[in-house]
Amino acid sequence: MSKIPSVNIKALLDAGVHFGHKTSRWNPKMASYIYGERDDVHIIDLRQSVALMSVALNAIYETVKKDGKILFVSTKIQASDIIAEYAEKCGQYYVNHRWLGGMLTNWKTIAGSIEKLNKLDKTLENEEALMGYTKKEILYMSRKKDKLLLSLAGIRNLNSKPDLLVVIDTNKEHIAINEAVKLNVPIVAVVDTNSNPDNVDYPIPGNDDSIRSIRLYCSLFADAALQGLEESMKASGVDMGAMQEHTDKGLTSKNVSKLKQAKKFSKTKNIDEETNTEFEKALNDADENKNSDNA
């Protein structure tokens, strides 16, 4: 029995995953993931999305199962809160505001900023220590802490590079992707029709702007990570009755060997006939409903 969450055409279609960008904004490197176009908007081939999502979810599951660390990254407004919510749900790490250059490649500097944040936290929580500061100084420290939290809250317990990067919007997060590539950190990413999938180990063709789509992705990612965590804890002899209490970021502290790159599905021949039929029927039904509404 599969340990990863199941995903189907209908769930993706209902979440609007099939809607790409206007045809004028496309990236030709995404051609093999595009089914066609409707009203000057590219339609993403959800048959491939289903297959590739399963590959990506398995990569997430295997990483956490082997005590690896996952870093979720998306700083776009509509994804910011969702990324944090689901990363915390599965006890992993996240960057959901500004990506600071060198977050992966210059970890020493980032670690220094995290140390500053922890010191500010300690000082501001110590009422006795605060008596030695003026109101202006305390206000300055509070603002400094808040500024650091925006960028570092999701990685303050990350003590080394992650074992897998999960990205929504490869265009916006190109710096994070470039740093991961330099450090040979595998990448899972949602790739829209205007994206460049070249450096992505586990691409998932899909809408990277819709809140419903983003929430669906993150829910699946978190569920896969939790399944991996459960297997890891079983192997360690942890009481599964206490599973819900184990969301401490320190749980995933061991390094794991790098996962082999999954074979990428880029041709419809890799998609089974049942999935082909399901996708085409779903699109036809959507068209019929649209025509009925406009009648």
Swiss-Prot record:
Record key words, sorted: Ribonucleoprotein, Ribosomal protein
Pfam families: Ribosomal_S2 (PF00318)
One cellular-component annotation, GO: cytosolic small ribosomal subunit
Region (Disordered): 263-295
Transmembrane regions listed in the UniProt entry: none
GO molecular function: structural constituent of ribosome
Keyword Ribonucleoprotein (UniProt): yes
GO biological process: translation
Basic and acidic residues composition bias: residue spans: 278-295
Entry-linked InterPro entries: Ribosomal_uS2, Ribosomal_uS2_bac/mit/plastid, Ribosomal_uS2_CS, Ribosomal_uS2_flav_dom_sf
Family: Belongs to the universal ribosomal protein uS2 family.
Name the record gives this protein: Small ribosomal subunit protein uS2
